[in-house]
């Protein structure tokens, strides 16, 4: 009877423990564990309380994951709206959620996706599986791992201690039932590494992966794993056997089988006597998770290299991974479209095309980048348009200046040519006037001699007959000289007329020259009149000489008349000599004025040449500026700028007929030798 009561009490206590575990499995973590019902159960109940605390912490961590999902969704929406500097508030998260948020934030900082490692235990906790082994956490979090390990050890020890009792059997049955129904993939092996337990989830998982595992392990059969050795998962199991034999804590491993990637959390199982009973393994199929990690990693690496064409494959994903893929793709797509638009516009600017604009609708930082880029292109287009119009204006002005300089150069050349011809004519006129003065001086001397002879004629009248022939010859010579003087006066008159014409052509500058030419003409006319009078007198003298032989008797009576006439001739010849001297002085002054005008014309020609060179240089610079600006395409064609001349250019006067004088030819040759070919 006492034994029966003991079994009943043990059964009741086992039921209590199983009820607590079932409530934990159902998510009822606020159920009070209570105190140990009897000595020996303290460690077990302490472990249950530690397990309850651990599960509460796991639930809190699940809430952190939900906060992470909310932050990621908000970041995705903000990125879709263009605010690419939005990040997940990692400072509000803890543990793995904070690390994932930090990785995503690094992706956001570089406008790329960040590699995000999603741990399989988070998914298992979300599904209500409380059996997976915890990672070896640092710092104070290591107490959580130790508490869970202690629970596993004490549960196994309690099961072995009560294996002979019905309560223990019931307890084990309930434990097994709980493990069978949890979502975690649990496998237990004994010390010989033979598989002694597999829950339904791990069997189903390995069954789904059987075809892939056989690619690497052809003899693998998921339906015959119970009782088999775990060596079936390894081609060379010696290393794994040694590792498990010396295992004292949680061991994490990654197993790749036929393209499948499994995460293994292995923990040794001890009884209350600290005897090794075997090992428990939590399997997690991380194939999809690993594939997602690889895709995110490739996306990050491509974006870091400037390639935004990569995307995370959305097909075949669901839940969190699907949302993550969509959000990352949306993020990269927004960055890609924005950078492509900016690249297209900058490429067009580099090619000189200022008509390109960013038309797509962006917000946030990309919106500002769009506005700044469009404003920059608009400002450049407006500035280059103004430069192009200014260059056209300068080019037109330079062309008109060059044209005006060409006309001015031609006129200056004609003026220089006329002045050179005038100078040549004045040289000849000066030479003629000097010759005329010399002849007048000689005539004056002859007239003086004739007067002296006439004065002595009274005393030598007896010699008149003998010298009549000589007088007749002298009279003929005088007549010839007077003819020459008459011709000189006529030529002087013609030259004075030509000088007046040239002075009229010179305009205002030739006014003084015209006055001098008029005086010369007056003197020439007076010389001509005097020459005519002398010619008349000489003709009369010749007639008288011819009649001298018959009038010798009358010579004495008319001698006084001859003396008076000869004195008159002497006076006239003196006047002719004085007029010739004045004429020579006037011609020299005219020649000096013409020389000064020629010098001024040459200086003007030099200034015109410099102005023409400056205008050509300005026109050339304007052309270069037009060529530089012409490579740019603007929104609107530049307006044509024309400068109206201040006055219509005067027609170029026809060049005067060249004078056939050797002096003109010599002057022209001298100009060419001095480098004045343009004038």
Curated annotation (Swiss-Prot):
Domain PAS: 171-213
Residue segments, region Divergent domain HAMP 4: 289-332
GO molecular function ontology, one term from the record: transmembrane signaling receptor activity
Compositional bias annotation for Basic and acidic residues: 670-679
Residue ranges, annotated region (Divergent domain HAMP 2): 63-112
Keywords: Cytoplasm, Heme, Iron, Metal-binding, Methylation, Repeat, Transducer
Highest rank taxon of the organism: Bacteria
Feature type site, description Important for gas binding and signaling: 264
Effect of residue 240 to A: Mediates wild-type responses to both O(2) and CO
Induction: Expression is regulated by the sigma factor RpoS.
Residue intervals of the HAMP domain: 333-385
Outcome when changing residue 199 to A: Signal-off mutant that does not respond to either O(2) or CO
Outcome (variant: residue 264 to V): Mediates an O(2) response but exhibits a 30-sec-delayed smooth-swimming response in N(2) and does not respond to CO
Effect of residue 283 to I: Inverted phenotype. Cannot form stable O(2) bound in vitro. Responds to CO
Function: Chemoreceptor that plays a critical role in the virulence and pathogenesis of P.aeruginosa in a variety of hosts. Probably acts through oxygen sensing. Uses a heme-based sensor. Could be involved in chemotaxis. When expressed in E.coli, is able to sense and mediate repellent responses to oxygen, carbon monoxide and nitric oxide.
Family: Belongs to the methyl-accepting chemotaxis (MCP) protein family.
Protein name: Methyl-accepting chemotaxis protein McpB
Gene that encodes the chain: mcpB
């Amino acid at each position: 009877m006492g034994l029966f009561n003991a079994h009943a009490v043990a059964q009741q206590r086992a039921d209590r423990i199983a009820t607590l575990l079932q409530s934990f499995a159902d998510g009822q973590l606020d159920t009070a564990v209570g105190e140990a019902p009897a000595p020996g159960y303290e460690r077990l109940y302490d472990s249950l309380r530690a397990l309850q605390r651990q599960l509460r912490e796991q639930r809190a961590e699940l809430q952190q994951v939900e906060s992470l999902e909310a932050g990621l969704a908000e970041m995705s929406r903000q990125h879709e709206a263009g605010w690419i500097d939005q990040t997940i508030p990692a400072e509000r998260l803890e543990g793995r959620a904070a690390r994932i948020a930090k990785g995503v934030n690094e992706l956001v900082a570089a406008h790329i996706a960040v590699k995000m490692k999603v741990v399989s235990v988070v998914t298992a906790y979300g599904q209500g599986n409380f059996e997976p082994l915890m990672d070896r956490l640092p710092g104070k979090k290591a107490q959580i791992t130790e508490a869970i390990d202690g629970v596993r050890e004490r549960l196994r020890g309690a099961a072995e201690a009560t294996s002979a009792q019905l309560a223990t059997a019931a307890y084990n049955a309930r434990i097994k039932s709980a493990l069978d129904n949890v979502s975690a993939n649990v496998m237990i092996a004994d010390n010989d590494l033979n598989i002694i337990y597999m829950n339904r989830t791990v069997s189903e998982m390995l069954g789904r992966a059987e075809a892939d595992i056989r690619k690497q392990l052809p003899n693998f059969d998921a339906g015959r794993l119970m009782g088999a050795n775990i060596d079936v998962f390894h081609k060379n199991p010696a290393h794994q056997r040694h590792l498990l034999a010396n295992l004292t804590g949680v061991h994490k491993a990654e197993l790749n089988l036929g393209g499948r990637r499994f995460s293994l959390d292995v923990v040794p199982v001890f009884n209350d006597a600290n005897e090794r009973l075997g090992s428990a393994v939590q399997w997690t199929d991380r194939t999809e998770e690993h594939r997602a990690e690889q895709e995110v990693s490739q996306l990050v690496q491509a974006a870091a290299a400037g390639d935004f064409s990569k995307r995370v494959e959305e097909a075949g994903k669901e839940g969190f991974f699907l949302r993550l893929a969509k959000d990352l793709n949306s993020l990269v797509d927004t960055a890609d479209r924005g950078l492509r638009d900016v690249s297209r516009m900058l490429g067009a600017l580099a090619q000189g095309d200022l008509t390109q604009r960013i038309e797509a609708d962006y917000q946030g930082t990309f919106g500002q980048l769009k506005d700044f880029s469009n404003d920059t292109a608009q400002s450049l287009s407006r500035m280059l348009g103004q430069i192009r119009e200014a260059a056209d204006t300068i080019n037109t002005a330079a062309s008109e200046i060059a044209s005006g300089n060409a006309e001015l150069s031609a006129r200056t050349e004609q003026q220089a040519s006329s002045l050179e011809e005038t100078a040549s004519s004045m040289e000849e006129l000066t030479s003629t006037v000097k010759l005329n003065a010399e002849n007048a001086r000689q005539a004056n001397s002859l007239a003086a001699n004739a007067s002296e002879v006439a004065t002595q004629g009274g005393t030598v009248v007896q010699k008149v007959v003998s010298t009549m022939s000589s007088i007749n010859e002298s009279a003929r010579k005088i007549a010839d000289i007077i003819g020459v003087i008459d011709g000189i006066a006529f030529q002087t008159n013609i030259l004075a007329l030509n000088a007046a014409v040239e002075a009229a052509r010179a305009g205002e500058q030739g006014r003084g020259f015209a006055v001098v030419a008029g005086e010369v003409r007056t003197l020439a006319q007076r010389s001509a009149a005097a020459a005519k009078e002398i010619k008349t007198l000489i003709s009369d003298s010749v007639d008288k000489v011819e009649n001298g032989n018959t009038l010798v008797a009358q010579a004495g009576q008319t001698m006084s008349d001859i003396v008076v006439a000869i004195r008159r001739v002497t006076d006239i010849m003196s006047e002719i000599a004085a007029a010739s001297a004045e004429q020579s002085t006037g011609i020299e002054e005219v020649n000096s004025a013409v020389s000064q005008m020629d010098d001024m014309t040459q200086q003007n020609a030099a200034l015109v040449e410099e102005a023409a060179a400056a205008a050509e240089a300005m026109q050339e610079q304007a052309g270069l500026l037009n060529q530089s600006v012409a490579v740019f395409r603007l929104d609107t064609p530049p307006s044509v700028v024309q400068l109206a001349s201040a006055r219509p250019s005067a027609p170029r006067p026809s060049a005067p007929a060249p004078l056939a004088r050797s002096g003109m030819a010599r002057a022209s040759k001298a100009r060419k030798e001095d480098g004045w070919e343009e004038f």
